[in-house]
């Protein structure tokens, strides 16, 4: 037996979340099903979990398989036959037996995409349509998140985290064509953290919440915003080991 690392992307609008679901509608279920067509039945482990409607341009999973799979490019090609159209295998690598796909992660990155173009039902599942805003001000507000923080007021209930302390390496905004993008990089994220963060920044930009209140929520003093930004604009974009 050997252990392989699978790097892949997926369309979150086709699933009820990345983790296995009771009705087999999770990304994990679909990828496990594709592997089973190739005779790989070992448990599939995922590096990150995403909610219903959240996408990934770069996700990672690991699984044990027979060491007779010597041609990993061929395995990738065959696996894509059973994974398309909503999952795409980008690369398969052999890893050491002690590789821990979730706990060996050094950092994760997410991007939240806003479209300022005219509404399109064909794009509605993949961006958050929103009026243009002050990108410089958004960058200033996002900067409040950078550093080691207790983000207990930026997480949904139901997570399995032992602590709400996280270190945010990057929180910034930038423009690309008709899009504005929020980029987050951290040593880990709490359940719903980014969507709560995005919604809180938008509330300040809309004048519905003050900078002082945002800072107090980040400093774990008081929660002013309980609402989450829609999931469709969020993408898991990088996992580093």
Curated annotation (Swiss-Prot):
Q: Which SUPFAM superfamilies match?
A: Pseudouridine synthase (SSF55120)
Q: Which catalytic residues are annotated?
A: 51
The record's keywords, sorted A to Z, are: Isomerase, tRNA processing
InterPro entries of this UniProt entry?
PsdUridine_synth_cat_dom_sf, PsdUridine_synth_TruA, PsdUridine_synth_TruA_a/b_dom, PsdUridine_synth_TruA_C, TruA/RsuA/RluB/E/F_N
What Gene3D superfamilies does the record point to? Pseudouridine synthase I, catalytic domain, C-terminal subdomain (3.30.70.660), Pseudouridine synthase I, catalytic domain, N-terminal subdomain (3.30.70.580)
Assembly and binders: Homodimer.
Q: Which NCBIfam families match?
A: hisT_truA
Instruction: Give the protein name, as stated in the record.
Output: tRNA pseudouridine synthase A
